[in-house]
């Protein structure tokens, strides 16, 4: 290009549209600045459907059976531009669905197939998702036909379910209800590597995988199929499998069922040298129209496809459910070889002709079946082998285990069963769905007021009631829709024993509420009483500040039992930090203020909502252990804006005592008048948060602060109430 003839930048207004043309950004200048972007992602401005769009309502209009039939027909309609292996797209769609759902991790509930994020970077370009762009394009005519009635998120997952059915495999149902996002998520930490497939970069010590990651390398869904760091060791591969599947919430039996069941279908693709493969979708040229991995080897498709670099089918009948995977796994000895692409894999020693697989394009041509290092782990690991041999001898048990594990895989990030849509939702409740009994009572406004009076007359303080309600509700994670106040699992193990919940105080509060419950003429759940107690305390605190308010309350929560609660499964919800209660379990490599932002994002809060809640919780004395850090008021228990007023007081100078503790000294006398944590001070330090804090510190916004605090409070209290459409705004009248 002749640079002398290149036009100047046409953006006179200074707007820029790509990193190359954006100049030096704030992030370039201050790479360690607090990232608040995750609190404003998925803004309505990016959603083409508009605020009024109701996916559940649209889905109710769907001809579900017709949709499934169209998917079945598509699977047998091989397209010249991307032909189906063995004449059936079923295995391809299973991989697409598995890789959509399989990014889920229990550590923070992020990932999974619940948002259709496989359409966007980085997932659409991960090496492990190679050529799945073609699977999504194959589905486009169906999405185009059914339009708003089926989300991409649901369709990507449903397609694999239909594929298993169509190939004779076992499924136990399907729940729809996944709503699409419209740009990549910014809150998910996929790792810190700058390149794909970099080996053990995310490990430390004795192969300890970084939390909350659930894949061994950047760009993989789970494990390296060639073995750890590409070394073909089945025993060491078993360690990686157990850890990564465990971080997705799967036990050994579920893991074996999924691997064996998934590899009953289809084949791996590594027909030639991977140098023939072009860039991933995000790096592909504009004329590729979002398709990546263009392949110049042979025809570039069919038997010439290059994806993972591994090559071959696992069974002799790769489009039919059977016990062939275990038959071959235990029926032969396996020798190490390499695929045409140079990847380590295993072939059977002297296989019978009946155990050879058909060629992807010509069923009359037979090719060797293969096993991957991770497949052989199911034979060489002692625990996996026991399960595998049991499944081999009991095909019906294997089929049932696979169907249940597959359903769990597809639905693990969807939260409670109340969110499921469609005619195929199983009647059975599964413990991983965190079931909560439904309630059959209603409360009149008068009864609610009577209950609030009883709670406020019980001797419990505003701080105790607010802290307990917050502890119950704030376990909610919008990532996988788990936690929350419904179920009152704060009464049960493990939550009742969590340090952050101050077990002695919690036991006292619950005892008082249970005593009130026992004296009532009608059934009211403890879950409702916990939330109502917090709401009553907020109303009392607002009244003390001069505002008569009604905190909206919607009864209808149930009380879960210990038998309905997976103790190990709930352990991952224990907060290691909760800035709203000024709690930090220990010092971490991530700052307390970053952990606050992460917590706020999981609660689905905006920056203003987070700010209002922090100010209110400090005023109400809701700190862990009753500490005075950040309690910038002489009227604890009164819902004032004192936190913001005193934080922004230029008469106070702040000095560090240690990493997470600061003293505020009077500039004139040098006297220590306040103490604070990093979470407190970030609302005066960060320019964005300070701007919001200034709004709430204004003399004319005392009422606005109360109103905004209540709105954010109710949002958290009702975060898991999927039966409620909208929270009513607090009715605020200044006294």
From Swiss-Prot:
Post-translation changes: Formation of the three residue Trp-Tyr-Met cross-link is important for the catalase, but not the peroxidase activity of the enzyme.
Protein name: Catalase-peroxidase
Record GO biological process: cellular response to hydrogen peroxide; hydrogen peroxide catabolic process
Regions of compositional bias (Polar residues) in chain numbering: 15-27
Annotated region described as Disordered, given as residue ranges: 1-27
Catalysis: reaction(s): H2O2 + AH2 = A + 2 H2O; 2 H2O2 = O2 + 2 H2O
InterPro entries according to UniProt: Catalase_peroxidase, Haem_peroxidase, Haem_peroxidase_sf, Peroxidases_AS, Peroxidases_heam-ligand_BS
Named cofactor requirement(s): heme b
Enzyme Commission number, as recorded: 1.11.1.21
Subunit structure: Homodimer or homotetramer.
Protein family according to the UniProt entry: Belongs to the peroxidase family. Peroxidase/catalase subfamily.
Binding residues annotated for heme b, in chain numbering: 263
Crosslink feature (Tryptophyl-tyrosyl-methioninium (Trp-Tyr) (with M-248)) location: 98-222
Lineage top rank: taxon: Bacteria
Organism: Halalkalibacterium halodurans (strain ATCC BAA-125 / DSM 18197 / FERM 7344 / JCM 9153 / C-125)
HAMAP family (alphabetical): Catal_peroxid (MF_01961)
Keyword Metal-binding applies: yes
Cofactor note: Binds 1 heme b (iron(II)-protoporphyrin IX) group per dimer.
